A protein has these predicted regions:
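Extreme N-terminal starter segment of soluble prokaryotic enzymes
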Residues: 2-4
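Short beta-strand-centered segments at strand-helix junctions
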Residues: 6-8, 13-53, 60-105, 110-137, ...
Length: 189
């Protein structure tokens, strides 16, 4: 591996509960897997929703499987565009976060909290963490090897035997670093 980490751009997306899915798409609806993602068991869905704020709306894909709570992950540019608050948080840390409306073909849901801008993070297995000399929840810096090399600070390491090695950044961060196509980064101390 030699400290080479695949960097993936995570575009705006939504995680929904089974209850929200049925309100948006109809009773008994299940998510349709369009494409498996790099993290085992995660997938992009055929289903899309409209994310509405006081200043506008954006289309976003749903990622599966369903979750215990609704979560909307936007870039800060997306959040400003539609007029919603999106604090920078780790996935799942939604208490007191932003609000929006989700609209689907069969109904809408008010998300009272759940809008975030995802904190930069690296998924890795315990073996990856041992090889890279890092631990779960550690904060690291990562240099991207692109046409506009950039060192991202405040990157949280997430370790689980259910993960595959990959760093996730949002579209704002990706654009700043020209992180297009297959991009790799390395942890710098």
């Amino acid at each position: 591996m030699a400290n080479k980490i695949l960097v993936e751009t995570s575009a705006r997306h939504v995680h929904v509960t089974a209850e929200t899915l049925e309100i948006l798409f109809g009773k008994g609806h299940t998510l349709t897997n369009k494409k498996d993602l790099s993290q085992p068991g995660q997938f992009a869905c055929e289903e899309k929703v409209t994310v509405k704020g006081p200043k506008g709306a954006l289309k976003a894909s749903i990622l599966g499987p369903t979750r215990p709570a609704d979560q909307v992950e936007l870039s800060l540019t997306d959040a400003r565009t539609i007029g919603v608050v999106a604090p920078v948080r780790e996935s799942g840390d939604i208490a007191g976060s932003g609000a929006c409306i989700l609209e689907g073909p069969c109904g809408s849901v008010e998300v009272k909290e759940g809008v975030i801008a995802a904190k930069r993070h690296i998924h890795m297995t315990p073996a990856d963490a041992a090889e890279l000399g890092v631990s779960d929840k550690e904060i690291v810096n990562v240099k991207l090897d692109t046409a506009r090399p950039l060192i991202f600070g405040d990157v949280v390491v997430r370790v689980s035997d259910k993960f595959a090695l990959a760093m996730h950044i949002d579209t704002d961060e990706s654009n700043a670093a020209c992180a297009f196509g297959e991009v790799y980064g390395s942890i710098v101390k």
